[in-house]
Structures are given as C-alpha cells and as structure tokens.
C-alpha cells in the first residue's frame, strides 16, 4: 500500500470519531441543561449513556482504522497522541457550542497530557510547553481583566483560559499568537454573518473557535503565517 493511501483510512476514522464525540456532547449538554454539575461525574455519566451500539461500533471501527495506520507506520506516537487531542478538542467545541461551558474534566487532562508528552520528548521542548501553558492562561486572564475594567463584566470564561493553556502545552508558546488570531477572526466572521451590525453586542462561545484553530495547529503546524 503506497504512502498516500493512509488518507483512505484516516478520513473514515475521523468521521467515526466525530460521530462518537457528537453523541457524548449531546448527552452531556442534556444533563447540564437539566441542572447537573459541570464536573467529571457528569462527563463520565454522559460517556456511559453514550455507549450504545452505534457508539461502540463507531469507536471500534475508528480504532481498527488507527491500528491499521500504526501497522502501516503512517501514524507515529506523536501523531497518534495529537489525533487523540483533536478528538478532545472536538468534544470541547461541541459542548461549548451547546451549553457554553468548557469542563475542567477535559481541559485539565488535555493540558497535563501535553506537558507529559513534552517531558517524554514528544512535541515541543519541556520549557516551551510550560511557557505555552502559562502564557496561554495568563494572557487571556489579562485580557479578561481589561474587559471587566472596561465593560464591568467578564468577556470570557475561565474555561477559555484553560483551553488556551492546554493548547500551549501541546504546541509551545510560539504558535499561540497565530492560534488566537485565527480563532478571533473566525469568531468575528461568524458574528458578523449572523448578527450583522449588531455583532459587537452579541455573545458567542469562543471555545469552538479556539479548538478549531488549535486542532489545525496540531495537524498542520502554523495556523496563520505572520510576515515578520
């Protein structure tokens, strides 16, 4: 099998993983809407509830595709880890889009996984990963503080800060400005298309755009190339 044929397995694996994430996110959102706590117990309950026959078939088929890719040596340890991170990012994006929350039960393990992989020699250097996690959280914390001073209320949740910290752990500190730029432009474009001139007054979850920009950075490297 030639090297290009790995795409024929990667695409169905991605689609099947997406179906599984959508089922988990749907059940999680229903529980949050019903008044459940935003914690790991609710997430575990959603995972158990989503473990239907369809979910298990999708998960098994996706895993089979991944195993074949590993045997073909088309998917190394870092690529496999990043694929898992992209699944978590997709799940976070779906949850935030539905109930406007980014659960710590997903963002914190994602951050620690990035830091541990960096310490194991996969991904950015440990110093860059630590700097990325710290810079991601502190930068958005500072932006939010300025927004509170200016408008009198918070402009984003702590989950966005923790998500950017997790992306910094996986990507290092250098790509974070590009990730933020891509996410901000995407959010602004969607707001303008949806609300027109009233876009500046609209509230839109930032997590899906951060997750999309970060996932693209994990898969392809730089999201936006600065000319300097």
Predicted regions and their residues:
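A membrane-topology feature that recognizes alpha-helical transmembrane segments
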Residues: 1-228
């Amino acid at each position: 099998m030639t090297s290009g044929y790995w795409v024929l397995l990667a695409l169905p694996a991605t689609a099947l993983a997406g179906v599984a994430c959508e089922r988990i996110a749907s059940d999680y959102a229903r529980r949050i809407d019903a008044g459940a706590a935003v914690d790991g117990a609710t997430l575990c309950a959603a995972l158990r509830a989503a473990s239907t026959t369809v979910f298990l078939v999708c998960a098994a088929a996706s895993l089979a595709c991944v195993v074949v890719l590993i045997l073909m040596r088309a998917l190394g340890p870092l690529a496999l880890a990043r694929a898992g991170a992209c699944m978590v990012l997709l799940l976070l994006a779906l949850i935030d889009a539905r109930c406007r929350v980014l659960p710590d039960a997903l963002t914190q393990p994602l951050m620690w996984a990035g830091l541990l992989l960096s310490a194991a020699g996969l991904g950015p250097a440990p110093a860059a990963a630590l700097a990325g996690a710290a810079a991601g959280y502190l930068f958005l914390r500072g932006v939010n503080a300025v927004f509170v001073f200016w408008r009198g209320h918070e402009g984003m949740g702590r989950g966005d800060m923790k998500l950017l910290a997790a992306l910094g752990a996986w990507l290092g500190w250098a790509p974070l400005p590009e990730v933020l730029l891509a996410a901000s432009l995407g959010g602004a474009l969607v707001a303008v298309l949806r609300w027109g001139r009233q876009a500046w007054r609209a509230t839109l979850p930032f997590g899906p755009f951060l997750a999309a920009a970060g996932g693209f950075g994990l898969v392809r490297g730089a999201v936006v190339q600065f000319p300097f």
